[in-house]
């Protein structure tokens, strides 16, 4: 019985989950919900099902795997990762995983808040001014390691790839000064399962956000 991943028909918080499902060769189907157009942005496709799925905290994304019903994007990632030993092995690796998991979400939400803000054009210059210093921290944290936790890939590499890719979509030259981050991106995209998925019709790189965002990618 395949797992069911439920989310809006955008990239959003499901991107890293989709990538991890593909990398682990997991059997899954997607339930994609469509947001209505402006000005109402009708959410009835989701709201009609929201409280009928048996979710403890009904929200998107969700993952249903038999009796296991999970919400919160990072809880979903961790659930999949535990099945495949992708949470780090040593204590040092697990600490690095925990740190980066939360750091990535902080940086992800900064960009989300900016892109949904009606004052986007006013706020964008300050965001871009501060971006190099934030990327420098990622570069220093990665160092000469192939993956963020160490020698072996973990689920936070999927989160890190997602947020770094979002930033280079937003500002295409932002990674130019950080060779190890560019190498990380290339290494990740070169993974056999990831490369195949990115070439498929199922892959969704654009539409970072919902229709109500002030700025979005195509």
Swiss-Prot record:
Localization annotation: Cytoplasm
EC code: 2.5.1.18
Alphabetically ordered keywords of this record: Cytoplasm, Transferase
Disulfide feature: none
Gene Ontology terms for molecular function: glutathione transferase activity; identical protein binding
Any single biological process term in GO: glutathione metabolic process
Catalytic activity: RX + glutathione = an S-substituted glutathione + a halide anion + H(+)
Classification via PROSITE patterns: GST_CTER, GST_NTER
Domain of life: Eukaryota
Subunit structure: Homodimer.
Cited function: Conjugation of reduced glutathione to a wide number of exogenous and endogenous hydrophobic electrophiles.
Protein name: Glutathione S-transferase Mu 5
Gene source species: Homo sapiens
Lineage: Eukaryota, Metazoa, Chordata, Craniata, Vertebrata
Gene name, Swiss-Prot/TrEMBL: GSTM5
